[in-house]
Amino acid sequence: MSILVAGLTLVSAFLITFLLMPSLIRYFRAKKEGQQIREEGPTWHEKKAGTPTMGGLLFILSAALTCGWVGAWQGQLNGTLGALLFTLIAYGLIGMWDDSIKIFNHQNEGFKPWQKFLAQVVGAMVFAVIYQHEGFQMGFGLTDWGWFYALFIIFWMVGFSNAVNLTDGLDGLVTGLATISFAAYLVLALVQGQTEVALFCLAMIGTLLGFFPFNHKPAKIFMGDMGSLALGASLAAVALVLHHEWSLLIIGIVYVLETLSVILQVAYFRRTGKRLFKMTPIHHTFEMMGWSEWKIDGVFWLVGLIAGALTVATILFLG
């Protein structure tokens, strides 16, 4: 991939999101439709109620359009890019469905958990079919895991889409983390010569950078489940296509720790009737300790950056 193509991809995705996001914000404000705050969430987040959400709508469209025109120009509209774009859009639609219920019904819960889970599983199954149809080699350095690998794909994609969704609780947190995560995979894709994956990662980085000025504290718009579910599933898909599945556990260490904090909190409370942490996901515990959102964001971004750099360096060193 030439510097010109990379630059145009990055700038195109950035500009589409950055220039059109103000119009989307004005539209949602005019409709007086905004984020509903969970009753069990931090009381100090109540002031965020009414903030426009579903910002993921625009940054998903921006990334898809950019991948489309650059891919057509470079002759890279193939199964690999198609699988990644399908994942981004499919999980975005799942999140859009969930967000719409919350917004237009003026409630803090979307559709039922089993409905969301089923939709996520179906999306992952379709990706698995595309994955197999396109003849991608199985991961883990093995030749054929058969149905087990298909089940792993579903588990990985559903798991990380929900992990990123749980992490999206502070202004700008997931936007910054996802940018770092896609940057790490961009390096791996370029080293492996996977230009379609590199194109996708560049488009995602560009669109997230365009979204960040409107999403950092104080956020003018949230990405919503539409954005967070799409980002998590897309990261899982990229890791799968690059055959570095397990790398996401480290590159996405913050998502993993946020999810583990929720699992441990629930398990500990059921066993003892007491809370292990002040509040989960764990970023809320740091808030209750007096940390500002900017401080939490900065520390978590640094952790993500170090984890991403170490993972990439290790993979490149080991060959």
From Swiss-Prot:
Source organism superkingdom: Bacteria
A Pfam family of this chain: Glycos_transf_4
Segments traversing the membrane: 1-21, 53-73, 77-97, 117-137, 140-160, 172-192, 195-215, 221-241, 249-269, 298-318
Catalytic activity: UDP-N-acetyl-alpha-D-muramoyl-L-alanyl-gamma-D-glutamyl-L-lysyl-D-alanyl-D-alanine + di-trans,octa-cis-undecaprenyl phosphate = Mur2Ac(oyl-L-Ala-gamma-D-Glu-L-Lys-D-Ala-D-Ala)-di-trans,octa-cis-undecaprenyl diphosphate + UMP
GO biological process, one term: regulation of cell shape
Cellular component annotations (GO), alphabetically ordered: plasma membrane
Membrane topology: Multi-pass membrane protein
Keyword annotations: Cell cycle, Cell division, Cell membrane, Cell shape, Cell wall biogenesis/degradation, Magnesium, Membrane, Metal-binding, Peptidoglycan synthesis, Transferase, Transmembrane, Transmembrane helix
EC number of this enzyme: 2.7.8.13
Compartment annotation: Cell membrane
Pathway(s) where this gene product acts: Cell wall biogenesis; peptidoglycan biosynthesis
Cofactor field: Mg(2+)
Main location (coarse class): membrane
GO molecular function: metal ion binding; phospho-N-acetylmuramoyl-pentapeptide-transferase activity
Biological role: Catalyzes the initial step of the lipid cycle reactions in the biosynthesis of the cell wall peptidoglycan: transfers peptidoglycan precursor phospho-MurNAc-pentapeptide from UDP-MurNAc-pentapeptide onto the lipid carrier undecaprenyl phosphate, yielding undecaprenyl-pyrophosphoryl-MurNAc-pentapeptide, known as lipid I.
Similarity-based family: Belongs to the glycosyltransferase 4 family. MraY subfamily.
Protein name, per record: Phospho-N-acetylmuramoyl-pentapeptide-transferase
Organism, scientific name: Limosilactobacillus fermentum (strain NBRC 3956 / LMG 18251) (Lactobacillus fermentum)
